[in-house]
Amino acid sequence: MTEIRLVDVTMRDGNQSLWGATGLNTAHMLQAATLTEACGFRAIDFTSSSHMAVAVRYFRNNPWERLRRMAAAMPTTPLQFITTGLRFIAWQQADPEFMRLVYRALQANGVGRFVLLDPMHEVPAVIEAARLVKEEGSAEVMAALTFTLSEIHTDQFYADFARAVGQSPDIDLFYIKDPAGLLSVDRARTLVPAVRAVIGNRPLEIHAHTTVGQGMMASLEAAKLGISAIHVGVGPGGDGSSLPEANRMVANLEEAGYEVGIDKAALARLTTYWQRVALAEGLPPGKPQNFDASFLRHQIAGGVMTTIARQLEELGLSDRMDAVIAETGQVRADLGFPIMVTPFPQMVMTQALFNVIGERRYAQVSDQVIRYCMGKFGKPTSPVDARVLATIMDRPRARELENEPMFPALSDLRRQFGTNLPDEEFLLRAVMPAEQVDAMLAAGPSRATYSPQAAPILSLLRQLAAKPQARDIVIEREGFRLALHAGASL
C-alpha cells in the first residue's frame, strides 16, 4: 500500500490565508506544539520573513524565541521557512552575505526545512539561495514550482525549470505550489508527470489552495500520480482560501486505498484545540468553497479584491469594479504575466485601478510597478510589453528610482548597528523600524501557555478595565471571588 505524508500549514499559510497572518501568536503555537508533534506530519509550514515581521509589529513577540521554543517542543518534525531566496522582510534584494547570516541564524534557531519560491522562476537565484542554505547548515531545501495560468506557464515551462534547478546538488525535493487554487484535476494529470519525469528520484509534494474548490480534488489526483506529500490545514485552519482540511484529506486518501502517515487520534486532539482557539479568538474557520470560473480569469485573491472595492466605494466609483477586474487581466499580460503571489496581486490590481479611473492607461504608475519593470524583483518571466515599458520608464519618478540606494552591504550594516549585537537582534534591526524592535524587546518573553477556555473572560476583563469609569471589577461564584482594582493590569 502506498504511503502519503501530510505537511501541516495551519500556523503559517492557514493563518495568513484565513486570518491575515495576525490570528495566531506565540502562545497559541506553543500550546499546540506537543499536539502537533504527536501527529507525525512530514513537516510544519511554520514561518516566513513576513510572518516574523508580523510577530514583532503586531504581537511584540520575538520571532527567534518563538522558533527556538517550537523547535525544542517538536524535535522530530521539521519546521519550514518559506522565502523568495535573497530577501528578508524588506522588499529589496539583500546582500548575499546578509542572506548567508539569515540562513545561519534560522538554522541555529530551529528551521529544518527551507522552501525557495522565486516568483519569476529565475534558476540562478534559486540555485544561489540553495547553496547559501546548505553552506550554513544541514536543513533540507525544497524548490517551488509556483503554479499559475497563462500562455507561458505551460507544463514544459515547469519541467524545464525543475530540470535546470535540479542540476544543483543542494536541492533535495520539489513541490508544486498553487497559491491561488487554480490547479484543476485535468491539469494535474499532465503537470505532475511532466515534472516527475525530470527530477529523478527526488520527492515531489503538492500545495494546492482551496480558494475556488479545486484543491482537494487536485491533491487527490496528484496522489495517484506519485507525489510524496500533500499540504493541509487542520480544522478551522483548512479550507476557504487555505489548503484542504486535514481530517477530510485523510478520510479521502484512505477511501482511495492509501496509507496516510498520520496518527489520527492525535490529529483529532489537535483539531479540537484549533477549533477552541478559533472560537475563543473570533477567527472565522475556513469553509469548503464553490467553484468560481471567473476566478480562473482574473486570479485576484479575496483580500486584494476587498481592498480595491473599498477604495472604489470611497471614491464613489463602485460601479467601475467590473472594469477594474477586466483591466487586471490586461495589466498582467502587459507586465509579462507575473504570478499572482505577494506582492504582485496588489501591484497589478492597483495599477488596473489607476488605469480605469485615470485620464489614460499608465498615466499614473506605482513605484512597485516601476521597480518591477526595472527588474528589481527579478527578471520578468516574459518581457514587459515594449510600448507599456516605454510609457512607464519615460517619467521623472522612474529616473529617481533608478538611483535608489541598494540594500547595504553586511559590513556597512554591522558598522551602523554595532558589532556587539546578537545576530538575531541585528537582523531584525537591519530591516525593521527601531521602535518596533525596541517595543518587542521591552515586552519580554512571550507567554508559553494558552487556554482557549479562559481567553473570552480575559478579553472581557481587559475591555472593562480599559473603561475610565471602571474602578473596581468583582467576579463571584460559589467558592470563588476575583476582585480587580484601579491600577491593576491584565
Describe the residue ranges of each PLM region.
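Terminal or standalone catalytic/regulatory effector modules within metabolic enzymes
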Residues: E37-A38, A43-V54, P288-F295, Q299, ...
